[in-house]
Regions:
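Short, intrinsically disordered terminal segments enriched in charged and Pro/Gly residues
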Residues: 1-45, 89-100
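Short linear motifs in intrinsically disordered
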Residues: 36-40, 63-68, 123-127
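Flanking scaffold residues of small Cys/His-coordinated metal-binding clusters
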Residues: 41-50, 71-72
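Acidic, aromatic-enriched beta-alpha/helix-loop junctions
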Residues: 46-48, 65, 142-145
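Short cysteine-rich clusters marking metal-coordination/redox-active sites
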Residues: 46-53, 77-80
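Short Cys/His-rich zinc-binding micro-motifs
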Residues: 56-58
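Short, compact, well-ordered microdomains
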Residues: 60-96, 163-182
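Positively charged, low-complexity terminal tracts
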Residues: 96-191
Length: 191
């Protein structure tokens, strides 16, 4: 079991070794998923497991639990059962909890591929509300499901389009285009 204090992984120096940086990114993603999704119940996020048993990627997904009132975040891989807790995450840059009440609208469920979900998590220009939608993406059996209102989906599509239009990396451009196409087609079809 990994016991981590998130504050130890914030503001890391540029020369930090790769494994430590990847662990920090993994813990950051877990906190974002746990705070972007429901509190009080364990749910399976679309975040992949980072372990490589036998030099092969673990096919598992991160199951996260954020108790209410806020304390430590529990996480566990659905396949290899790698697990841990993260403390001191409240009010960090990775804390995506809503700060005020919002009006709930009708939700659309959109099926995504692993590649599209990964591209959405890698977006750099997301506001907090869109980041919450992206990190609350769930794995449901073989499906990966993004749940969003029409307004949230419009906002996310606009942000993906803006980033895709300004992307100079030729490897990243097709991933952003695929994410834009998947969201646009699903939105046009009504979710």
């Amino acid at each position: 079991m990994l016991v981590a204090d998130l504050h130890h992984f914030l503001d890391l120096p540029d020369d930090i070794p790769g494994p430590a940086r990847r662990l920090a990114e993994h813990l950051s993603s877990i906190v974002r998923a746990a705070t972007g999704g429901d509190a009080g119940t364990a749910w399976m996020s679309a975040l992949p497991c980072r372990r490589r048993p036998g030099n092969r990627s673990c096919p598992g997904r991160m199951v996260v639990l954020r108790p209410e009132p806020a304390s430590v975040i529990h996480w566990e891989c659905s396949t290899c059962h790698d697990e841990g807790v993260i403390s001191n995450w409240g009010d960090s840059p990775d804390d995506l909890r809503r700060r005020k009440l919002t009006v709930a609208g009708a939700l659309n469920e959109i099926d995504l591929t692993d590649a599209v979900a990964s591209a959405l998590r890698d977006l750099r220009l997301l506001d907090t509300d869109s980041e919450r939608v992206v990190f609350a993406v769930r794995a449901d059996g073989e499906r990966i499901v993004l749940t969003a209102t029409d307004d949230e989906l419009d906002q996310l599509i606009g942000l993906v389009a803006a980033e895709a239009n300004h992307e100079t990396n030729r490897r990243r451009q097709p991933r952003l285009d695929a994410a834009f196409d998947a969201l646009s087609v699903a939105h046009a079809a009504g979710g």
